[in-house]
Amino acid sequence: MDPPSLMSDGSSWSKLPLDLLIMVFERLGFVDFQRTKSVCLAWLYASRMSAPNKQIPWLIMFPEKGKDFCLLFNSEEKEKIYRIQNLGVEFANSHCLAIYGSWLFMRDPRYKLYIMNLFTRERINLPSVESQFGRIKIEQINDDLFYRKVDDEYDYHPKRHMIDISDHILWIDDKTKDYVVMWSFECGYTYMVYCRTGDNIWNYRSLDISTVNIVYKDHKMYLYSYTRDVKVLDFCEDIPRQIFETQVNYDILMEKGFRSDVDDVLNDKKEHLVVTLNGDVLRVKSKIWDNSDVWSFCIYKLNSSNTYWEKLTSLGDEAILLDLGITVLANTIEGINRNSIYFSGYHRPHYFRFDHVWSEKDICVFNLDTQEVERPHQSICSSIQISGARWFVPNFKHI
């Protein structure tokens, strides 16, 4: 298809080669990209063949249950918020488990799982959670309560019947719609459950570790365990295979023995795994003191022999999106704070041993240089009641 005729006003900027325009447009942020579309017909045509820079973090905010819209906040525009409306009754009563690009991994009130595109409304239904995994069978007792049977029998201890479905992960290719969806549960060790394009049942792999956090990036699954070890599984083939494992010198019992009573009582903390642009793995510890709304963070990187976590004081020109477990380049992109951590709070309330309730104050950008917290969204969201939020990197190809 040939581009439309160019405007005949003699302006040379309207006659730039299409390849050059596309190259320029793909370097723009969202705001400048939208402005360039209105310059002339040739620029509008070029914009439809490209997309704004994909590495700018946006914040998606979910209102109270029963509302069929969500809110988007762009880091480039400090005083503006976008509303995506009419997302449907099912969306209004669903809960977001994970996000990738412009796709949401959702569960409805009956714990039916699906993924949907925020902008096109395209939806893909996923298999039922009630499944058989070798000797283990998962049964749904009520809306969000699941029991497990081993060899078709319940465990002798009633509380051990219950399983906690966690570590929700989504990856999808916007062009081909190929996807990978994951979640996990514990039964002695971690069972990693996954579904790929074309699957009508859940596949699984039992792991000989108990995981704290899982990240999926570049067709690899990174697992972080309670012993502070990292395993990497390659998902390029039908059956995932292990390609990397650490042997970290860490004694969890010794650390607990030396922990002070004050530290144990006055704060709550969680550890996260992050994979950098060049494939390095980082350990990020987030901590909040009881009766406080101020978060603090520490970052660690494996030493050269992969046996010890060393404290890292700078990310250089990268920034961490903790919700996604990745870093993005921040040195040339307006709207991203370099050497910072983008955080939206804990998404599983049972992490908290105290009465800390999630609020919009948990959404923040932590600057590693100053050790200070910024809440860029707060001035425009103070009057809006939200129930949750996540930082993500949207794909605006279909806008």
Swiss-Prot record:
This is Probable F-box protein At4g22060. InterPro entries: F-box-like_dom_sf, F-box_BR-signaling, F-box_dom, KIB1-4_b-propeller. Pfam families: Beta-prop_KIB1-4, F-box. Coiled coil: none annotated. Residues 12-48 form the F-box domain.
